[in-house]
């Protein structure tokens, strides 16, 4: 699972996801990519599950880029605990995603194989996505 090595604060505020993604909105490294269509938070487990689904489909060919990183801590209170008495302990990491953000990119395999691999990855994610092809291909 992906997680940051060091953070300035153990617990963050939740924040809000508003507007479109301004950075990371174009296919930069690969030939074809998976782009988010709606807001959401992807956990490190979901990011890894989608990556494994892609890699199993394309087997040994091609290269995959993960364009997001889970750097936002997620906290939770223990089960059967009353409310109050502070914020819960950190339990994992998530990546806030805005619409228009490219999540994964693939290069080095045929377009049909890459589309199928990205479709399998999209089934593992909790947000709506679309497949985009790099300009000029």
Curated annotation (Swiss-Prot):
GO terms for cellular component: cytosolic large ribosomal subunit. GO terms for molecular function: rRNA binding; structural constituent of ribosome; tRNA binding. Binds 23S rRNA and is also seen to make contacts with the A and possibly P site tRNAs. CDD domains: Ribosomal_L16_L10e (cd01433). Part of the 50S ribosomal subunit. PANTHER family: 50S/60S RIBOSOMAL PROTEIN L16, LARGE RIBOSOMAL SUBUNIT PROTEIN UL16M. Belongs to the universal ribosomal protein uL16 family. GO terms for biological process: translation. Keywords: Ribonucleoprotein, Ribosomal protein, RNA-binding, rRNA-binding, tRNA-binding. Pfam families: Ribosomal_L16 (PF00252). It comes from the Bacteria. This is Large ribosomal subunit protein uL16. NCBIfam families: rplP_bact. Gene3D superfamilies: Ribosomal protein L10e/L16 (3.90.1170.10).
């Amino acid at each position: 699972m992906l997680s940051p090595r060091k953070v300035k604060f153990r617990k963050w505020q939740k924040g809000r996801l508003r507007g479109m993604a301004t950075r990371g909105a174009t296919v930069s490294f690969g030939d074809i990519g998976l782009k988010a269509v709606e807001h959401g938070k992807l956990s490190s487990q979901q990011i890894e599950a989608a990556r494994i689904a892609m890699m199993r489909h394309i087997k040994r060919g091609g290269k995959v880029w993960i364009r997001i990183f889970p750097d936002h801590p997620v906290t939770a209170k223990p089960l059967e605990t009353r409310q109050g008495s502070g914020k819960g302990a950190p339990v994992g990491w998530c990546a806030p995603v805005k619409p228009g953000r490219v999540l994964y990119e693939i290069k080095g395999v045929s377009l049909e194989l890459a589309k199928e691999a990205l479709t399998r990855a999209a089934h593992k994610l909790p947000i709506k996505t679309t497949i985009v092809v790099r300009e000029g291909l």
